[in-house]
């Protein structure tokens, strides 16, 4: 980050890392968070303010949006009556949600959201694969759920289909958590960058 008084990148999601049961996966997501562009930790979730609640519309807004999406996922994943995901799958889902908007304005910050940001962050993960011990199935799941997290909003401004639509339960779950965390009716309270319990 830019100044010595700012948090280290990996510290922003300390609470969220604790939701990941597997120590290696926890270390992997920290490694990947550290690779995200600095701007991710500073900017609002929406460049226009149109598509996210007020808590996500100021400094650190994208981090707050991400934290809310992770918290929604955790609450749903902790309720065995609502899902039948295995622990390993839950860990990958949490990893994906932490990373899903990591390159929202590109690798180098652009003025607006990059429509293809799910593909950009997926590419960043693939570039760092050799530093991760995820097997092929885990890597595929991580990339698949990030790439499709935009749901039905998968076309660029010219109407070209760019992003995959969620097709399986994992993709639909990650999309749902992202979608819900961006709803304007949400009024999540924060203490700094942490959700108040």
Question: Where are the model-predicted features located?
Answer:
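An active-site-proximal "capping" alpha-helix that borders the catalytic cofactor pocket
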Residues: 69-72, 114-131
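Acidic/His-rich, divalent-metal-binding segments that scaffold phosphate/diphosphate chemistry
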Residues: 1-107
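Inter-helical turn/loop segments and adjacent helix faces that build the functional surface
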Residues: 80-84, 129-136
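Metal-dependent catalytic cores of enzymes that make or break cyclic nucleotides
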Residues: 109-113
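Secretory-pathway/luminal and periplasmic proteins that interact with or process carbohydrate-rich
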Residues: 101-108, 151-157
């Amino acid at each position: 980050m830019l100044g010595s008084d700012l948090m280290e990148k990996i510290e922003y999601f300390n609470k969220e890392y604790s939701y990941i049961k597997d120590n290696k996966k926890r270390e992997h997501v920290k490694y990947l968070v550290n690779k995200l562009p600095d701007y991710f930790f500073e900017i609002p979730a929406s460049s226009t303010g149109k598509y996210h609640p007020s808590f996500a519309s100021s400094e650190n807004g994208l981090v707050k949006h991400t934290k809310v999406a992770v918290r929604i996922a955790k609450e749903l994943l902790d309720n065995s009556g609502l899902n039948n995901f295995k622990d390993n799958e839950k860990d990958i889902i949490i990893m994906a949600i932490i990373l899903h908007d990591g390159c929202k304005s590109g690798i180098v910050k652009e003025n607006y959201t990059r429509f293809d940001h799910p593909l950009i962050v997926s590419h960043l993960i693939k570039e760092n694969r050799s530093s991760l011990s995820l097997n092929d199935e885990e890597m595929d799941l991580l990339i698949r759920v990030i790439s499709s997290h935009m749901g039905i909003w998968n076309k660029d401004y010219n109407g070209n289909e760019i992003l995959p639509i969620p097709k399986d339960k994992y993709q639909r779950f990650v999309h749902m958590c992202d979608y819900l965390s961006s709803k304007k009716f949400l009024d999540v309270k924060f203490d700094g960058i942490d959700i108040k319990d």
